[in-house]
Structure formats: C-alpha cells, structure tokens
Amino acid sequence: MPLAVELAGVAFGYRPGQRVLEDVDLRIGEGEFVAVAGPNGGGKTTLVRLALGLQRPSGGRALLYGEAAHRFSRRRTLGYLAQRTELGGYAPTTVRELVAAGRLAAGGLIGPMRRRDRELVSEAIERVALADVADAPLRTLSGGMQQRAFIAKALAGEPSLLVLDEPTTGVDAESQESLAALLDRLHSELGVTILYVSHEFGAVERFVERLVLVRRTIIFDGPPSALPGVWHDPSHVHA
C-alpha cells in the first residue's frame, strides 16, 4: 500500500534536552482511517504537525507521499482542521461563505469562482448535511454543526488527506457520535485518508481501522479490538 504519511525515528523538542517526542515510527497508508489518541501534552498534536510539515523534526525524517513533509509540493491537497475553541472572526460568516473560502484557497483562485468550483462548494455542504443552513451565520449553529461546516470547508478543496485535531472539543456526546459516523461515511464514499486526533477515542473507535496511542512515543498501534482492556479506561491512557 502506498504511504500517505511516514515518520521514521522522529524526535522533537522545543528546547535542547527537553523532548516532546522521541523514537516515533509511524506509517499510514493511502486510504486508511486512523485515530491518534493520548493525554494532553503527550505529543499527539506535535506528531501531526511534524507529519504535515508544519514543524521540522529534531531527528529522524517525516515524509508526505514520499516527499520531505516540510517541502511537500502538493500542500493544497491536504485538509487540516486545527484545534479550535471559539469561532473568532468566523462568527458572522455563513456556511456557504466558509466553504467557498476553502475552495478558493485550495484552488489558488482569485476573483469569482467558476461553475465547477461553485458545484464543489455545494457538494461539500450537502455531504455534511448542512444544505438547509447553508446561508446561516456560523454563530447561530450548534458546536457539532459548526464542526461539520469546517469539515465541508476542507472537503471543498478535494483533499487526499484529511487531518482533524481535537474535532470534538466543546461538542456533546451525541454530536461526537454523529461526527464520527460522518467521517466514516466520507471515508467510504471518497476514499480519503483520515487522521483523527483526540485525547478521547471512544466515539470513533468502532469506525477506525487503526488506533495509535501517543505518550512521548507510540505506545500502541493496531486495531482497536487488540487494545488491552485497561486501555479503554481513559484514566489509564491519561496517566
């Protein structure tokens, strides 16, 4: 299977002698749906940023589709939803405007969108079941619906890799389940590689093919069914 992400012997520290990650080996094949979990401060967000080339490792190598991640030439094919705790300047933006901005950014477009671009925006909104509120400001929507809108923004760019960092922050349990089911459907329909990053993995566990637990290094990598029973207790993972 061709690799979308490869980390080999990766280490990283913000200061000399203080490692956030060390000896990380991770390979994610094209088309996989993988969850990365671990305690806050355990290095999972740093791992993702290294994988995407947003930071460079102190040691080892990080590759995206076979290229050095920090020099990846097809960055517009990546959909990255960074951890977000509030809407900020997005509050008055409508769903359609947000998704259109994603299409414009991915296509490097300036000025009015072409017909095909408008179609992709509408398709992305429909895929996340927000067509009925496409012209509503984000601030009027629930947390779960807001997160769907940001997923649609990423989808409008036709990504080959979709990365979500803590997508369920501030979202209730029912919306977490709904979001996980949506990602599973998108994975099946589009064949996109999905990397789901969270300190909790319960909502997505039954949908992913692999679960990767990170606590400074990778302490588990395999199917959720192979996870030792004690690890299903979040207090154990977060210890």
Predicted segment positions?
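Conserved catalytic motifs of ABC-family nucleotide-binding domains
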Residues: E158
